[in-house]
Amino acid sequence: SSHRLPSVQVETLSERFTEQLDKTAQKLTDVKGSLDYFRAVSAYANHLNKEDMRFRNLMFNGDILIPKEKIAEIYYGFNENYNLRNRLESTKEELMKILNRKIHVEMRKKWVEDAVQNLSKEEIQQFHAEGEEEILNADKEFISRNHWLSINNQFVHMLKEMPKILNLADFGISNELWAEEIKATVGRLKKGRLSLADASSYIYLYDLMTGKRGDKDIRYLFIDEVQDYSAFQLAFLKFSFPRAQFTLLGDLNQAIFTHENSRKLLGELGSDSIQS
């Protein structure tokens, strides 16, 4: 997942296995690895079509060029039938138009006059051309790479909303314990880190926010040691490769999700070969 999340370092498997999980930590890992949690993340993302998407200001020279409130206004100003993918693409187009207009205005400001006062006419023309290009390239990349979305803030907001979507008591988790876990997650994110238990839901949420539909060209997927995967991870793989026929190998008696859930989930995955 590291290439998918360049700004976040995910806990490795070896780090995970050296941790001795107490019963409380195990409960948190169990809920985050469940099929119910996968559905809860999906439901949360669906809600983002109407409200609560988190945005970041588009900056230039330390100043706000396009405020996040304006981005929110654009994003939620489209037809209510738009899905997250439509909203993302249409907002990008609108931001590019605004950016082009604002840069032309910016290049006529006093700081530009001061910078070019001792230059020749040709040098001034070159300064304007290169200056606009340089600004546009940086901000266009900010827009095209979806950096105006705030995945960390969004992920934390999702965790805070989770008790409204999912009955955590079913997993033996109190609201107080969940609040403590959110605090720990925020602490990790501030250090640029993410627990292995959070990695799948973080990537899945980002994929939903950015309208990814999965790789439809992959037709066959072989997964060994399937008992080491959580139900969430398998459901996420199904989302990521929607047309793939799954062949799962491993010992289902040792699966980290329940036997009943595993059979149901494997059935949904359309697995043609399950060895247990």
Question: What is each model feature region?
Answer:
Residues 22, 26, 100-104, 241, ...:
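Hydrophobic/aromatic-lined pockets within catalytic cores
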Residues 29-39, 178-183, 206-209, 232-243:
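Charged, low-complexity, helix/coiled-coil-prone segments
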Residues 44, 48-220, 233-234:
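Conserved helicase NTPase catalytic core signature
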Residues 2-46, 50:
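P-loop NTPase motor core
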Residues 2-11, 207-220, 227-276:
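Conserved helicase motor core of SF1/SF2 NTP-dependent helicases
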Residues 38-47, 182-188, 242-251:
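Short charge-dense sequence patches
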Residues 9, 18, 31-34, 83, ...:
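Alpha-helix initiation/capping motif
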Residues 27-30, 34, 54, 101-108, ...:
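Intrinsically disordered or highly flexible coil/loop and linker segments, enriched in small
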